[in-house]
Amino acid sequence: IISLNRRHGVQIITTSRGGTEICTESNIINYTVNKIKRSDIMSMLKKLSESQEVEEDTLQQIFHMLKGNTSLVETMNCPLLVTLFYICYPHLDSIPDSATEFYSKLFTTLYFRHDKVKNYKRERKSDIPPPEAFNVFCALCFKSIYDNKQDFTELSLFEYTKQSLALCGANEARPEDIAYDFVDITCLIQRDGYDRYVFLHKSIQEYHAAEYVKSLSLEKKRQFMGAILESIQNEPKLSATA
């Protein structure tokens, strides 16, 4: 991107998280996108309701809730969270007060969705218990993010799932079955073109990878943090933050 701009005078608009490398380059003008407002959320929900993926009265219930719940509006601070909340709302036992609380409910809510919706046709292929499936998904997120991997072929998805099952001591389960459930039941990993699978959003991968690290023993956490610190110190661009 920088080379195209400097060598050919091409003006380029890019999107990025704040604080990434491109934000600190010379001749870059940074603009910050405003957080979405209540009216934006309602407009998105109206559009989502056209898919008829949930019951007809769900939209009005959410509208009513948004009018009196500022905390909920602040939680749904990006289109992704609005979409996920709309899908998950009929199956939530309680309304989340923060993005972190919402993410903590996300996998289980979607994994159990077929049990709670009468006309939901997809059945889980794997018979491992839901808490174990959650652990495997967290391990998959950790292993892939550790390898700087955000997308998969079908074969590599099966391989990462197999490795994640081994990390969780669930070797008896078929990787193909649990991978199917991650894609077709939770939809947190999605098909994207021919033989390509991606996480619904990078934040899904990041949150569940953090959950995996949180579940490690104290000694394993020490080893992991030591490896991260060493990696930072060996990376010139990051050494100042070590």
Regions found by a protein language model. Give the residues of each.
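C-terminal leucine-rich, beta-strand-based interaction scaffolds used for sensing/assembly
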Residues: 124, 149, 158-222, 226
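Short glycine/serine- and small hydrophobic-enriched flexible loop segments
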Residues: 83-90, 142, 211-214
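P-loop NTPase signaling cores
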Residues: 1-113, 134-136, 154, 162-182, ...
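A eukaryote-biased feature capturing mid-to-C-terminal, repeat/solenoid-rich segments of large proteins
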Residues: 95-110, 209-238
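Cullin-RING E3 adaptor/co-adaptor recruitment helices
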Residues: 120, 127-141
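Amphipathic alpha-helical elements of HEAT/ARM-like alpha-solenoid repeat scaffolds that form extended
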Residues: 85, 237-242
